[in-house]
UniProtKB/Swiss-Prot annotation:
UniProt note on tissues of expression: Expressed in pods.
Organism of origin: Pisum sativum (Garden pea)
Signal peptide: none
Membrane-crossing segments per the record: none
Keywords, in A-Z order: Repeat
Keyword Repeat in record: yes
Record lineage: Eukaryota, Viridiplantae, Streptophyta, Embryophyta, Tracheophyta
Entry protein name: Organ-specific protein P4
Amino acid sequence: MMSLRSAFALLPLFLFLIVANVESRKDVGEYWKLVMKDQDMPEEIQGLLDASNIKNSKTHAKENKGAIGEFEPCPNASAYGDNEIHANENKGAIGEFETRPNGSAYGDNEIGAEFTDDFEPRPSMTKYNA
């Protein structure tokens, strides 16, 4: 008798999950054109589909415009795997630049650094061992 009560308690949750996903595909017409090689959907089928274009903030992804404006990132020197990078090796490279470098090593100790004039980075050093 107790398992029947718990099943009835979970029933509204499962029904909500099913109903929430009913309108998962809004652009059925676009899918039809893609599959049918740019042929229009027949009028007989169009009447069967609900093609409302009402935007729901929960179902449509918001566009991320990225970073706008100036910001100061925190660069780091990172080493992954069996890289042998010591603090003594990096001191010479740091002294040669006006801005502090962002050096990263991946795989076979290939160290690359990219700089942008607008940034004033703060140094940090991270090493990940395998």
